[in-house]
Protein backbone atom coordinates (compact mmCIF):
# COMPACT_ATOMS: atom_id res chain seq x y z
CA UNK A 1 0.00 0.00 0.00
CA UNK A 2 1.16 3.50 -0.81
CA UNK A 3 0.69 4.90 2.69
CA UNK A 4 2.59 2.08 4.35
CA UNK A 5 5.32 2.07 1.72
CA UNK A 6 5.83 5.85 1.85
CA UNK A 7 6.01 5.69 5.63
CA UNK A 8 8.55 2.89 5.54
CA UNK A 9 6.21 0.62 7.51
CA UNK A 10 5.82 -2.37 5.18
CA UNK A 11 6.82 -4.75 7.96
CA UNK A 12 4.51 -5.39 10.89
CA UNK A 13 5.69 -4.90 14.45
CA UNK A 14 6.10 -8.42 15.88
CA UNK A 15 4.19 -7.49 19.05
CA UNK A 16 1.18 -6.39 17.00
CA UNK A 17 1.34 -9.21 14.47
CA UNK A 18 -1.97 -11.05 14.31
CA UNK A 19 -2.34 -14.83 14.70
CA UNK A 20 -3.33 -16.82 11.57
CA UNK A 21 -6.97 -16.34 10.62
CA UNK A 22 -7.31 -12.87 12.16
CA UNK A 23 -7.86 -9.57 10.34
CA UNK A 24 -7.59 -5.97 11.52
CA UNK A 25 -10.41 -3.59 10.55
CA UNK A 26 -11.68 -0.11 11.44
CA UNK A 27 -15.07 1.44 12.07
CA UNK A 28 -16.31 4.63 10.41
CA UNK A 29 -15.25 6.68 13.43
CA UNK A 30 -11.72 5.24 13.58
CA UNK A 31 -11.90 2.47 16.18
CA UNK A 32 -9.90 -0.67 15.45
CA UNK A 33 -11.50 -4.10 15.83
CA UNK A 34 -10.34 -7.62 15.08
CA UNK A 35 -12.13 -10.29 13.04
CA UNK A 36 -11.50 -13.98 13.75
CA UNK A 37 -12.41 -15.73 10.49
CA UNK A 38 -11.92 -19.19 11.99
CA UNK A 39 -14.52 -18.70 14.73
CA UNK A 40 -16.47 -16.04 12.78
CA UNK A 41 -16.46 -13.47 15.57
CA UNK A 42 -15.09 -9.97 16.21
CA UNK A 43 -13.64 -8.22 19.25
CA UNK A 44 -12.19 -4.84 20.25
CA UNK A 45 -9.07 -6.19 21.97
CA UNK A 46 -5.96 -7.27 20.07
CA UNK A 47 -5.87 -11.10 20.31
CA UNK A 48 -2.23 -11.14 21.46
CA UNK A 49 -1.67 -7.92 23.41
CA UNK A 50 -5.19 -7.33 24.72
CA UNK A 51 -4.89 -3.63 23.82
CA UNK A 52 -7.62 -1.50 22.29
CA UNK A 53 -6.58 0.85 19.52
CA UNK A 54 -7.83 3.62 17.30
CA UNK A 55 -6.38 5.15 14.16
CA UNK A 56 -4.61 8.50 14.46
CA UNK A 57 -5.34 11.55 12.34
CA UNK A 58 -6.92 11.96 8.93
CA UNK A 59 -6.50 9.70 5.93
CA UNK A 60 -3.27 10.11 3.95
CA UNK A 61 -3.39 12.61 1.10
CA UNK A 62 -5.26 11.18 -1.91
CA UNK A 63 -7.29 8.64 0.10
CA UNK A 64 -11.06 8.62 0.63
CA UNK A 65 -13.28 6.53 2.90
CA UNK A 66 -16.49 5.02 1.47
CA UNK A 67 -19.05 2.37 2.42
CA UNK A 68 -20.19 -0.54 0.24
CA UNK A 69 -23.74 -1.89 -0.15
CA UNK A 70 -23.23 -4.18 2.85
CA UNK A 71 -22.23 -1.32 5.14
CA UNK A 72 -18.57 -2.33 5.09
CA UNK A 73 -16.07 0.54 5.17
CA UNK A 74 -13.51 0.55 2.34
CA UNK A 75 -10.82 2.96 1.19
CA UNK A 76 -10.01 4.43 -2.22
CA UNK A 77 -6.44 5.45 -3.10
CA UNK A 78 -7.01 7.98 -5.88
CA UNK A 79 -3.28 8.50 -6.45
CA UNK A 80 -2.49 4.86 -7.24
CA UNK A 81 -6.04 4.03 -8.40
CA UNK A 82 -6.70 1.13 -6.05
CA UNK A 83 -9.34 0.10 -3.53
CA UNK A 84 -8.81 -1.76 -0.26
CA UNK A 85 -10.71 -2.69 2.88
CA UNK A 86 -7.54 -2.10 4.92
CA UNK A 87 -7.42 1.35 6.52
CA UNK A 88 -4.07 2.95 5.56
CA UNK A 89 -4.01 4.66 8.95
CA UNK A 90 -3.48 1.29 10.62
CA UNK A 91 0.21 2.06 10.23
CA UNK A 92 -0.30 4.87 12.75
CA UNK A 93 -2.60 3.45 15.44
CA UNK A 94 -2.46 4.67 19.02
CA UNK A 95 -3.38 2.78 22.17
CA UNK A 96 -6.76 3.56 23.72
CA UNK A 97 -5.50 3.65 27.31
CA UNK A 98 -6.35 7.01 28.91
CA UNK A 99 -5.51 5.76 32.41
CA UNK A 100 -1.84 5.35 31.52
CA UNK A 101 -0.55 8.54 29.94
CA UNK A 102 2.85 8.48 28.30
CA UNK A 103 5.52 11.16 28.21
CA UNK A 104 7.11 9.75 25.04
CA UNK A 105 7.39 12.41 22.38
CA UNK A 106 5.36 11.88 19.24
CA UNK A 107 8.32 12.00 16.85
CA UNK A 108 12.01 11.22 17.30
CA UNK A 109 15.21 10.46 15.40
CA UNK A 110 13.73 7.40 13.69
CA UNK A 111 10.67 9.24 12.38
CA UNK A 112 10.44 9.81 8.62
CA UNK A 113 9.22 12.92 6.84
CA UNK A 114 6.32 10.96 5.34
CA UNK A 115 5.20 9.86 8.80
CA UNK A 116 5.04 13.47 9.94
CA UNK A 117 2.90 14.47 6.96
CA UNK A 118 0.61 11.44 7.25
CA UNK A 119 -3.01 12.54 6.90
CA UNK A 120 -2.12 16.12 5.91
CA UNK A 121 -3.33 17.82 2.72
CA UNK A 122 -1.14 20.69 1.51
CA UNK A 123 -3.14 21.50 -1.60
CA UNK A 124 -2.86 25.24 -2.23
CA UNK A 125 0.39 25.59 -0.28
CA UNK A 126 3.60 26.66 -2.04
CA UNK A 127 6.93 25.31 -0.80
CA UNK A 128 10.41 26.30 -2.01
CA UNK A 129 13.34 24.02 -1.12
CA UNK A 130 16.90 25.02 -1.99
CA UNK A 131 19.36 22.29 -2.92
CA UNK A 132 16.49 19.89 -3.53
CA UNK A 133 17.94 17.72 -6.28
CA UNK A 134 19.39 15.16 -3.86
CA UNK A 135 19.68 14.13 -0.22
CA UNK A 136 17.42 15.52 2.46
CA UNK A 137 16.45 18.43 0.24
CA UNK A 138 15.01 16.02 -2.29
CA UNK A 139 13.20 14.01 0.39
CA UNK A 140 11.79 17.23 1.84
CA UNK A 141 10.53 18.35 -1.56
CA UNK A 142 9.16 14.92 -2.44
CA UNK A 143 7.32 14.55 0.86
CA UNK A 144 5.50 17.85 0.42
CA UNK A 145 4.77 17.18 -3.27
CA UNK A 146 3.22 13.79 -2.46
CA UNK A 147 0.90 15.58 -0.04
CA UNK A 148 -0.47 18.07 -2.53
CA UNK A 149 1.83 21.09 -2.16
CA UNK A 150 3.13 23.06 -5.12
CA UNK A 151 6.86 22.47 -4.66
CA UNK A 152 9.68 24.38 -6.33
CA UNK A 153 13.13 22.81 -6.36
CA UNK A 154 15.60 25.71 -6.31
CA UNK A 155 18.88 24.27 -7.61
CA UNK A 156 22.14 25.29 -9.26
CA UNK A 157 22.35 22.23 -11.55
CA UNK A 158 19.20 22.24 -13.67
CA UNK A 159 19.93 18.87 -15.29
CA UNK A 160 19.98 17.15 -11.90
CA UNK A 161 17.02 19.21 -10.72
CA UNK A 162 14.98 18.08 -13.74
CA UNK A 163 15.89 14.47 -12.96
CA UNK A 164 14.68 15.01 -9.39
CA UNK A 165 11.38 16.39 -10.67
CA UNK A 166 10.99 13.32 -12.89
CA UNK A 167 11.60 10.99 -9.94
CA UNK A 168 8.84 12.67 -7.97
CA UNK A 169 6.45 12.53 -10.92
CA UNK A 170 7.19 8.81 -11.29
CA UNK A 171 5.82 8.33 -7.77
CA UNK A 172 2.76 10.45 -8.46
CA UNK A 173 2.11 11.80 -11.94
CA UNK A 174 -0.20 14.53 -10.61
CA UNK A 175 2.39 16.03 -8.27
CA UNK A 176 2.72 19.78 -8.73
CA UNK A 177 6.49 20.14 -8.81
CA UNK A 178 8.95 22.18 -10.85
CA UNK A 179 12.60 23.24 -10.87
CA UNK A 180 14.06 26.74 -11.00
CA UNK A 181 17.66 27.90 -11.28
CA UNK A 182 19.31 29.19 -8.12
CA UNK A 183 23.08 29.49 -7.65
CA UNK A 184 23.71 30.69 -4.11
CA UNK A 185 27.36 31.34 -4.95
CA UNK A 186 26.25 34.18 -7.23
CA UNK A 187 24.21 37.04 -5.79
CA UNK A 188 22.87 37.97 -9.23
CA UNK A 189 21.51 34.44 -9.58
CA UNK A 190 19.70 34.81 -6.26
CA UNK A 191 18.26 38.07 -7.53
CA UNK A 192 17.14 36.48 -10.81
CA UNK A 193 15.51 33.58 -8.97
CA UNK A 194 13.53 35.95 -6.75
CA UNK A 195 12.39 37.95 -9.77
CA UNK A 196 11.31 34.79 -11.62
CA UNK A 197 9.48 33.49 -8.57
CA UNK A 198 7.61 36.75 -8.04
CA UNK A 199 6.62 36.74 -11.71
CA UNK A 200 4.61 33.58 -11.03
CA UNK A 201 2.28 35.57 -8.75
CA UNK A 202 1.95 32.74 -6.26
CA UNK A 203 2.17 32.83 -2.46
CA UNK A 204 5.04 31.34 -0.47
CA UNK A 205 4.06 29.42 2.64
CA UNK A 206 7.26 27.48 3.36
CA UNK A 207 10.84 28.36 2.43
CA UNK A 208 13.40 25.70 3.29
CA UNK A 209 17.00 26.98 3.23
CA UNK A 210 18.56 23.56 2.78
CA UNK A 211 21.37 23.92 0.23
CA UNK A 212 24.91 23.71 1.58
CA UNK A 213 28.44 22.99 0.52
CA UNK A 214 30.93 21.05 2.61
CA UNK A 215 34.68 20.32 2.49
CA UNK A 216 35.42 22.49 -0.51
CA UNK A 217 38.98 23.56 -1.26
CA UNK A 218 39.43 27.26 -0.64
CA UNK A 219 37.94 29.41 -3.36
CA UNK A 220 36.31 32.77 -3.84
CA UNK A 221 32.95 33.28 -5.51
CA UNK A 222 32.52 35.78 -8.34
CA UNK A 223 31.30 38.13 -5.62
CA UNK A 224 34.71 37.92 -3.95
CA UNK A 225 33.70 35.96 -0.84
CA UNK A 226 34.79 32.57 0.47
CA UNK A 227 32.48 30.02 -1.15
CA UNK A 228 31.28 28.10 1.93
CA UNK A 229 30.26 31.30 3.69
CA UNK A 230 28.38 32.66 0.69
CA UNK A 231 26.58 29.45 -0.28
CA UNK A 232 25.65 28.32 3.22
CA UNK A 233 24.79 31.70 4.73
CA UNK A 234 24.89 34.85 2.64
CA UNK A 235 23.08 33.46 -0.40
CA UNK A 236 20.20 32.27 1.75
CA UNK A 237 20.19 35.54 3.68
CA UNK A 238 19.78 37.46 0.42
CA UNK A 239 17.13 35.05 -0.84
CA UNK A 240 14.98 35.59 2.25
CA UNK A 241 15.49 39.34 2.03
CA UNK A 242 14.19 39.35 -1.54
CA UNK A 243 11.22 37.09 -0.77
CA UNK A 244 10.21 38.47 2.62
CA UNK A 245 7.41 40.60 1.17
CA UNK A 246 5.90 37.49 -0.46
CA UNK A 247 6.28 35.54 2.79
CA UNK A 248 4.53 38.28 4.75
CA UNK A 249 1.66 38.48 2.26
CA UNK A 250 1.31 34.69 2.51
CA UNK A 251 1.23 34.62 6.32
CA UNK A 252 1.19 32.43 8.23
CA UNK A 253 4.44 31.40 6.59
CA UNK A 254 7.51 29.54 7.81
CA UNK A 255 11.23 29.67 7.05
CA UNK A 256 13.32 26.63 7.95
CA UNK A 257 17.11 27.01 8.01
CA UNK A 258 19.06 23.76 7.93
CA UNK A 259 22.01 24.09 10.32
CA UNK A 260 24.09 21.44 12.08
CA UNK A 261 25.26 20.34 15.51
CA UNK A 262 28.74 21.24 14.25
CA UNK A 263 27.87 24.87 15.02
CA UNK A 264 28.89 24.07 18.62
CA UNK A 265 32.55 23.61 17.75
CA UNK A 266 33.45 27.11 16.64
CA UNK A 267 32.99 30.82 17.22
CA UNK A 268 32.85 33.78 14.85
CA UNK A 269 33.80 36.46 17.37
CA UNK A 270 37.30 37.68 18.14
CA UNK A 271 38.98 37.73 21.55
CA UNK A 272 37.07 40.92 22.41
CA UNK A 273 33.72 39.33 21.62
CA UNK A 274 33.24 41.25 18.37
CA UNK A 275 32.17 39.64 15.10
CA UNK A 276 35.31 38.83 13.11
CA UNK A 277 34.77 38.97 9.34
CA UNK A 278 38.12 37.28 8.72
CA UNK A 279 36.69 34.16 10.36
CA UNK A 280 33.64 34.20 8.11
CA UNK A 281 35.46 34.71 4.82
CA UNK A 282 39.08 33.73 5.52
CA UNK A 283 42.11 34.00 3.27
CA UNK A 284 43.57 30.87 1.72
CA UNK A 285 46.28 30.64 4.40
CA UNK A 286 43.71 30.80 7.22
CA UNK A 287 41.21 28.43 5.64
CA UNK A 288 40.21 25.02 6.98
CA UNK A 289 37.22 23.41 5.26
CA UNK A 290 35.63 21.88 8.36
CA UNK A 291 35.96 25.09 10.36
CA UNK A 292 34.45 27.10 7.51
CA UNK A 293 31.47 24.74 7.44
CA UNK A 294 31.01 24.91 11.23
CA UNK A 295 31.09 28.70 11.17
CA UNK A 296 28.53 28.85 8.38
CA UNK A 297 26.23 26.59 10.40
CA UNK A 298 26.57 28.92 13.39
CA UNK A 299 25.60 31.76 11.08
CA UNK A 300 22.51 29.78 10.07
CA UNK A 301 21.14 29.70 13.61
CA UNK A 302 21.98 33.34 14.31
CA UNK A 303 20.26 34.32 11.06
CA UNK A 304 17.17 32.21 11.76
CA UNK A 305 16.77 33.67 15.25
CA UNK A 306 17.14 37.26 14.08
CA UNK A 307 14.81 36.65 11.14
CA UNK A 308 12.16 35.39 13.53
CA UNK A 309 12.55 38.43 15.77
CA UNK A 310 12.07 40.73 12.78
CA UNK A 311 9.30 38.97 10.84
CA UNK A 312 7.23 37.13 13.46
CA UNK A 313 5.10 40.25 14.11
CA UNK A 314 4.10 39.97 10.43
CA UNK A 315 3.17 36.30 10.62
CA UNK A 316 6.44 34.76 9.40
CA UNK A 317 8.28 32.41 11.75
CA UNK A 318 11.74 30.89 11.43
CA UNK A 319 13.38 27.88 13.04
CA UNK A 320 16.77 26.21 12.55
CA UNK A 321 17.23 22.45 12.43
CA UNK A 322 19.92 19.78 12.62
CA UNK A 323 19.03 16.99 10.16
CA UNK A 324 21.24 14.17 11.42
CA UNK A 325 24.79 12.97 11.84
CA UNK A 326 26.99 11.87 8.94
CA UNK A 327 24.15 11.19 6.53
CA UNK A 328 25.40 9.82 3.23
CA UNK A 329 24.71 12.43 0.57
CA UNK A 330 26.42 14.41 -2.15
CA UNK A 331 27.40 17.17 0.27
CA UNK A 332 30.70 15.39 1.01
CA UNK A 333 31.74 14.78 -2.59
CA UNK A 334 34.53 17.38 -2.77
CA UNK A 335 37.27 15.29 -1.12
CA UNK A 336 37.92 11.54 -1.07
CA UNK A 337 38.76 11.54 2.66
CA UNK A 338 35.24 12.72 3.52
CA UNK A 339 33.77 10.24 1.03
CA UNK A 340 35.59 7.42 2.83
CA UNK A 341 34.49 8.74 6.23
CA UNK A 342 30.85 8.93 5.17
CA UNK A 343 31.02 5.45 3.63
CA UNK A 344 32.38 3.90 6.83
CA UNK A 345 29.76 5.69 8.93
CA UNK A 346 26.86 4.81 6.66
CA UNK A 347 25.52 1.80 8.65
CA UNK A 348 25.11 4.05 11.70
CA UNK A 349 23.41 7.00 10.04
CA UNK A 350 19.84 8.06 9.40
CA UNK A 351 18.10 7.42 6.11
CA UNK A 352 17.41 10.49 3.98
CA UNK A 353 13.71 10.26 4.85
CA UNK A 354 14.65 10.33 8.53
CA UNK A 355 17.08 13.17 7.88
CA UNK A 356 14.31 15.24 6.30
CA UNK A 357 11.93 14.63 9.20
CA UNK A 358 13.02 17.50 11.45
CA UNK A 359 12.87 19.97 8.56
CA UNK A 360 9.38 18.79 7.64
CA UNK A 361 8.35 18.77 11.30
CA UNK A 362 9.22 22.44 11.72
CA UNK A 363 7.67 23.32 8.37
CA UNK A 364 4.38 21.52 8.83
CA UNK A 365 3.18 20.55 12.31
CA UNK A 366 0.24 22.61 13.61
CA UNK A 367 1.67 22.83 17.13
CA UNK A 368 4.46 25.12 15.86
CA UNK A 369 2.11 27.62 14.22
CA UNK A 370 3.29 31.08 15.23
CA UNK A 371 6.33 29.74 17.10
CA UNK A 372 9.94 30.27 16.08
CA UNK A 373 13.38 31.43 17.06
CA UNK A 374 14.19 27.87 18.11
CA UNK A 375 16.60 25.08 17.21
CA UNK A 376 15.45 21.49 16.66
CA UNK A 377 17.20 18.12 16.58
CA UNK A 378 15.39 14.79 16.10
CA UNK A 379 12.03 16.61 15.93
CA UNK A 380 12.62 17.98 19.41
CA UNK A 381 13.57 21.46 20.54
CA UNK A 382 17.05 21.71 22.06
CA UNK A 383 19.29 24.56 23.08
CA UNK A 384 22.00 25.63 20.63
CA UNK A 385 25.41 26.83 21.76
CA UNK A 386 25.65 30.01 23.85
CA UNK A 387 27.24 31.74 20.84
CA UNK A 388 24.23 30.84 18.70
CA UNK A 389 21.90 32.44 21.26
CA UNK A 390 23.62 35.84 21.24
CA UNK A 391 21.19 38.51 20.06
CA UNK A 392 24.02 41.02 19.73
CA UNK A 393 26.03 38.73 17.43
CA UNK A 394 22.90 37.98 15.42
CA UNK A 395 22.17 41.68 14.89
CA UNK A 396 25.78 42.37 13.95
CA UNK A 397 25.82 39.46 11.48
CA UNK A 398 22.58 40.73 9.95
CA UNK A 399 24.02 44.21 9.45
CA UNK A 400 27.26 42.80 8.04
CA UNK A 401 25.34 40.57 5.63
CA UNK A 402 23.31 43.52 4.36
CA UNK A 403 26.48 45.56 3.87
CA UNK A 404 28.29 42.78 2.01
CA UNK A 405 25.40 42.39 -0.42
CA UNK A 406 25.11 46.13 -1.02
CA UNK A 407 28.85 46.45 -1.61
CA UNK A 408 29.03 43.49 -4.01
CA UNK A 409 26.00 44.37 -6.08
CA UNK A 410 26.86 48.06 -6.03
CA UNK A 411 30.36 47.45 -7.39
CA UNK A 412 28.99 45.13 -10.10
CA UNK A 413 26.43 47.66 -11.30
CA UNK A 414 29.11 50.31 -11.39
Swiss-Prot record:
Compartments (UniProt record): Cytoplasm; Nucleus; Mitochondrion; Golgi apparatus
Any one GO CC term of the record: nucleus
Pfam families reported in the protein's UniProt record: adh_short (PF00106), WW (PF00397)
Region of interest called Disordered, as start-end residue ranges on this chain: 1-23
Phosphotyrosine: modified positions: 33, 287
Residues bearing the modification Phosphothreonine: 12
Principal EC category: oxidoreductase
Any one GO molecular function term: identical protein binding
Effect annotated for changing residue 29 to V: No effect on interaction with TP53. Abolishes interaction with MAPK8
Biological process terms in GO annotation: cellular response to transforming growth factor beta stimulus; extrinsic apoptotic signaling pathway; intrinsic apoptotic signaling pathway by p53 class mediator; negative regulation of Wnt signaling pathway; osteoblast differentiation; positive regulation of extrinsic apoptotic signaling pathway; positive regulation of extrinsic apoptotic signaling pathway in absence of ligand; positive regulation of transcription by RNA polymerase II
Documented effect of changing residue 28 to T: No effect on interaction with TP53. Abolishes interaction with MAPK8
EC assignment: 1.1.1.-
Protein name in UniProt: WW domain-containing oxidoreductase
Gene name tied to this protein: WWOX
Amino acid sequence: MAALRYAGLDDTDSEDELPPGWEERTTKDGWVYYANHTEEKTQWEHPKTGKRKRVAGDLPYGWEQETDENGQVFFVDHINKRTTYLDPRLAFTVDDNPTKPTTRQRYDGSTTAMEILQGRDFTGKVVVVTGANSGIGFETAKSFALHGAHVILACRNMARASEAVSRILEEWHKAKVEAMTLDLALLRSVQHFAEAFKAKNVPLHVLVCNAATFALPWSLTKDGLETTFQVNHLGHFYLVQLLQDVLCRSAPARVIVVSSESHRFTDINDSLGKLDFSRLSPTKNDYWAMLAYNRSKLCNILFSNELHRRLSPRGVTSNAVHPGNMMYSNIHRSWWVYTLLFTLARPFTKSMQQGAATTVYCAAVPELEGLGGMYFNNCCRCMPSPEAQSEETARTLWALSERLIQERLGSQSG
